[in-house]
């Protein structure tokens, strides 16, 4: 053990290095000295094994703690640091699978105790979902329309068809894990030798390494594109509601399904109409004479102009209902109603002739107005006990 190099020195990190720093250093060195990158180079192969041995210890918190305390002797099967009892207990239970006792031993030796996992090679992966927002007019939301949206998403590389490899070449089997996507390492404990399995850090669980990456996608298998899609806006959709387009998200990896596209609708405010559920409200002005004498007027609706009758003596704030002139029900038949509120406008400027006519009118109704006013003050006196 005395001839072995310090593990921290091998990876080129300080003893106080974080897990992330150790992992970063390992990946850099592993790629540099990997046998696939240095075919026939025995020195590089030996260096690669040395790097993996160092990382196997320093990447495991428990092993690292034992190494920091005992050095290389921590893993000497004939020494106390290796987990034996110091009296030659080297074989123990061999590669025994502790089965139901795993939870007990895990408390002492960590979650990796006796682990035998299935292949960690990553298979097909679903593409990511995408979220967009789309602005539509009040009328478009009411009656529906078809609009176009440009989506930025990752799509299958047209050059390599998603393999990530340059055409005419194939990925090579990872020598670190022999194509399994996993590496095994043995650990000696007071109960014997156990086998742990982890994802291969060289191929990241793929089992293969791309030595000739596709020039279009850089070996990733997907490229970013801006794609135009047609979106059908259903009649009756409301502000804030979402339309989902299945399979229109980012393309999957290794033949995995594509993600979905979710479009949130933003309805522009209308200068006249306000929506309440499936009903439409609006306010229109009428003149004093129209309210007093009655009239037939035109009012705006979503379908165009509609005539309504204003009865004689209509008061300001009166609401008229136009049945079936509201918003269509979403994915259903029928429509809401429209409610028209009238506001009586008082003229701000009058010429002398108009003023004279109003004075005459005031004289004609003067007694009535006086009686109404008198009645009002009498009620006030009664209420106040005057």
From Swiss-Prot:
Sites where the protein binds Zn(2+) 2: 174, 177, 200, 203
Domain of life, source organism: Bacteria
Major location category of this protein: cytoplasm
UniProt cofactor(s): Zn(2+)
Note on how the cofactor is bound: Binds 2 Zn(2+) ions per monomer.
Subunit structure and binding partners: Homodimer.
Domain notes for this protein: The J domain is necessary and sufficient to stimulate DnaK ATPase activity. Zinc center 1 plays an important role in the autonomous, DnaK-independent chaperone activity of DnaJ. Zinc center 2 is essential for interaction with DnaK and for DnaJ activity.
Family (UniProt): Belongs to the DnaJ family.
Name of this chain's protein: Chaperone protein DnaJ
Species of the source: Acetivibrio thermocellus (strain ATCC 27405 / DSM 1237 / JCM 9322 / NBRC 103400 / NCIMB 10682 / NRRL B-4536 / VPI 7372)
Gene: dnaJ
């Amino acid at each position: 053990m005395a001839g072995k190099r310090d593990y921290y020195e091998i990876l080129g990190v300080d003893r106080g290095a974080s897990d992330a720093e150790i992992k970063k250093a390992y990946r850099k060195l592993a790629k540099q000295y990997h046998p696939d990158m240095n075919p026939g180079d025995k020195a590089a192969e030996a260096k690669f094994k040395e790097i993996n041995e160092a990382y196997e210890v320093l990447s495991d918190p428990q092993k690292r703690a034992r190494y920091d305390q005992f050095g290389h002797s921590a893993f000497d099967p004939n020494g106390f640091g290796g987990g034996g009892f110091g009296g030659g207990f080297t074989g123990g239970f061999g590669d025994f699978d502790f089965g139901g006792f795993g939870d007990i031993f895990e408390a002492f030796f960590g979650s990796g105790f006796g682990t035998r996992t299935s292949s960690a090679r990553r298979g097909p992966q679903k593409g990511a979902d995408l979220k967009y927002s789309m602005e539509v007019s009040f009328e478009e939301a009411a009656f529906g329309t078809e609009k176009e949206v440009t989506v930025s998403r990752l799509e299958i590389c047209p050059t390599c068809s998603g393999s990530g490899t340059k055409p005419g070449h194939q990925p090579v089997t990872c020598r670190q894990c022999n194509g399994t996507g996993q590496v095994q390492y043995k650990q000696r404990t007071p109960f014997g030798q156990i086998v742990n399995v982890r994802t291969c850090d060289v191929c990241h669980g793929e089992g293969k390494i791309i030595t000739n990456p596709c020039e279009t996608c850089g070996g990733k298998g997907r490229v970013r594109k801006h794609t135009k899609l047609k979106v059908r806006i259903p009649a009756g959709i409301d502000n804030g509601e979402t339309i989902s387009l299945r399979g229109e998200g980012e393309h999957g990896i290794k033949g995995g399904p594509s993600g979905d596209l979710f479009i949130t609708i933003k309805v522009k405010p209308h200068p006249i109409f306000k929506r309440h559920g499936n009903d439409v409200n609006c306010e229109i002005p009428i003149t004093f004479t129209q309210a007093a004498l009655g009239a037939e007027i035109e009012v705006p609706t979503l379908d165009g102009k509609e005539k309504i009758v204003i009865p004689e003596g209509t008061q300001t704030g009166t609401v008229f209902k136009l049945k079936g002139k509201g918003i269509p029900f979403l994915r259903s038949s029928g429509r809401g109603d429209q409610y028209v509120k009238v506001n009586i406008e008082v003229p701000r400027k009058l010429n002398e002739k108009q003023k004279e006519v109003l004075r005459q009118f005031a004289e004609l109704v003067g007694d009535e107005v006086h009686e109404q006013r008198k009645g009002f003050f009498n009620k006030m006196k009664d209420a106040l006990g005057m």
